[in-house]
Amino acid sequence: MVHALAAETDETAQAADIVERFLVASMVPDPQTAARYISDELKITFTGGRKYRHPRETAAFNAKRYKWVKKKMERTDIVPAKGETIVYNLGTLYGEWPDGTPFDGNRYVDRFVVRGGKIVQIDVWNDSAERLIAKQVIEA
């Protein structure tokens, strides 16, 4: 079965803009600015099933995993739903591991649920764990 995406509306365009602004603030990282775009009921699930409630928590996790990390946002897909908009942001991560080794081309998919002009849910997937495992195997 093939489903066509609905034409972009003001609501879906606004949801995509909210997500992009959130991601830009998160990459600084500026959790305070990122928090402008989230609901008080925000639920974040990171890779490995890690649960968070606020951008400052994900920034703290990323500070342990990476020396620094940024996103090359390549595509945004918008899926309108009843009472909410689902926004997928896809691309690659680049930056440095804690030991200073650079990396690039690390795929990611972020899924956002936007309701009432706020992000209420974020699901994050990326290849970082796979790359860290491969790096350890190569160095061992």
Enumerate the predicted regions with their spans:
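Short, low-complexity N-terminal intrinsically disordered segments enriched in polar/charged residues
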Residues: M1-R36, D40, I138-A140
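Low-complexity, intrinsically disordered terminal/linker segments enriched in charged
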Residues: A6, Q121-A140
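Hydrophobic pocket/interface hotspot
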Residues: F22, T33-A35, L42, T58, ...
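A solvent-exposed, acidic/Ser-Thr-rich amphipathic alpha-helical stretch
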Residues: P31-T85
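Residue-level structural signal for beta-strand termini and adjacent loop
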Residues: E57, Y108, V124-D127
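Short, surface-exposed coil-to-beta transition loops
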Residues: K71-R75, F103-V109
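A short hydrophobic beta-strand element
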Residues: G83-L93
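Beta-strand elements of well-folded, non-transmembrane domains
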Residues: G95-D99, V114
